[in-house]
Amino acid sequence: MEQGEKQVMEQATYDEPEREQPIEEEAAPQPEEESGGVPLEEAGGEEAAEPAEKAPTAEELAAAKAQIAELEAKLSEMEHRYLRLYADFENFRRRTRQEMEAAEKYRAQSLASDLLPVLDNFERALKIETDNEQAKSILQGMEMVYRSLVDALKKEGVEAIEAVGKPFDPYLHQAVMQAEAEGYEPNTVVEELQKGYKLKDRVLRPAMVKVSQ
């Protein structure tokens, strides 16, 4: 009897279902380590703990001021050099323009100067007096050539310098004689010995004159 009860109890023990074990919840991960295994809070603490920038010393400030002064001096020197170069360039350009204008204005100077002796010869020849009809005809032809030459030079700006009766002008006249002359103020041209010429406002040859005392 006891043996039968024992078997029944053992069987009941074996047949009892297993109790479910409670499932433990996984712990939420802690905001842990970033690289290097350092917690974020500690990492932030390190950043906050960085020291402030160091103020420059008096020596560093003095060196910086000296460098600034040196740069300002160099800048001022470069500015002066630029202004000088610009002024030189402007002077060169103005001088070149004036030379070109003068070359255009006085382009006939060389030819006119070479023709002045020819005009002198024509004038001396035309002063000859003759009764010979053939010589008169030649002189008339020479006068026509002379007038044509004078007109051509006049178109280029060549003109004779006025002399007799004009006040002596050392720029226009060359005094070769002085003499008493009635009816003339002192220092007045009383006679023209050789005609002078000018090209526009430039004297090609001054007139050779006699001047009153």
From Swiss-Prot:
GO terms for molecular function: adenyl-nucleotide exchange factor activity; protein homodimerization activity; protein-folding chaperone binding; unfolded protein binding. GO terms for biological process: protein folding. InterPro entries: GrpE, GrpE_coiled_coil, GrpE_head. It is found in: Cytoplasm. Residues 1-61 are annotated as: Disordered. The lineage of its organism: Bacteria, Bacillati, Bacillota, Bacilli, Bacillales. The gene is grpE. This is Protein GrpE. Keywords: Chaperone, Cytoplasm, Stress response. PROSITE patterns: GRPE. HAMAP family: GrpE. PANTHER family: GRPE PROTEIN, GRPE PROTEIN HOMOLOG, MITOCHONDRIAL. Homodimer. One of its GO terms (cellular component) is cytoplasm. Participates actively in the response to hyperosmotic and heat shock by preventing the aggregation of stress-denatured proteins, in association with DnaK and GrpE. It is the nucleotide exchange factor for DnaK and may function as a thermosensor. Unfolded proteins bind initially to DnaJ; upon interaction with the DnaJ-bound protein, DnaK hydrolyzes its bound ATP, resulting in the formation of a stable complex. GrpE releases ADP from DnaK; ATP binding to DnaK triggers the release of the substrate protein, thus completing the reaction cycle.
